Amino acid sequence: MTAKFTVLVLNGPNLNMLGKREPTIYGNQGLSEIIADLGLQADQKNIVLKHLQSNAEHELVDAIHNGYQQVDFIIINPAAFTHTSVAIRDALLSVAIPFIEVHLSNVHAREAFRKHSYLSDIATGVICGFGAQGYSFALDAAYTYLNKAQVDK
């Protein structure tokens, strides 16, 4: 069976340390577990899931550019780049791929500097505060969005 959609999941700096880094804020589940669970969910929906975690901004920008006309949707947890990266914002605008911004913690209930996002105003949606389950919510939302877009054509 041919995949119906391709979704790119991007994770920014320090997310490789999930499960070890501040588990009271970010949870005990490691990123590899989160992506494995998401892969099972994607398989059930006939979605090809691609994933990249990088601590380097330019690698995330390159992955976004490489997704042009190759992926149908992006799920991105930009982590600390949320508050600093005009480059990631511009990359997302340049490819015009719909995307959801995901955060494990509720960034609006944390330090003031975490409340500003360079991506939220251009995102299809934002999910925050649900821990690892936020990725699952994002994949469900992406699937619904893409199916509706096909019907609306």
UniProtKB/Swiss-Prot annotation:
InterPro entries, per database record: DHquinase_II, DHquinase_II_CS, DHquinase_II_sf
Catalysed reaction, written as an equation: 3-dehydroquinate = 3-dehydroshikimate + H2O
Gene symbol of the encoding locus: aroQ
An example Gene Ontology biological process: quinate catabolic process
Marked site: Transition state stabilizer: 21
Transmembrane domains' residue ranges: none
PROSITE patterns in the cross-refs: DEHYDROQUINASE_II
Subunit annotation: Homododecamer.
Catalytic residues (positions): 26, 103
Residues noted as binding substrate in the record, renumbered to the chain: 77, 83, 90, 104-105, 114
Protein name: 3-dehydroquinate dehydratase
Taxonomic lineage: Bacteria, Pseudomonadati, Pseudomonadota, Gammaproteobacteria, Alteromonadales
Function in brief: Catalyzes a trans-dehydration via an enolate intermediate.
Entry's EC annotation: 4.2.1.10
Gene3D superfamilies for this protein: Dehydroquinase, class II
Similarity comment: Belongs to the type-II 3-dehydroquinase family.
Gene Ontology molecular function: any one: 3-dehydroquinate dehydratase activity
Pathway connected to this protein: Metabolic intermediate biosynthesis; chorismate biosynthesis; chorismate from D-erythrose 4-phosphate and phosphoenolpyruvate: step 3/7
Top EC group: lyase
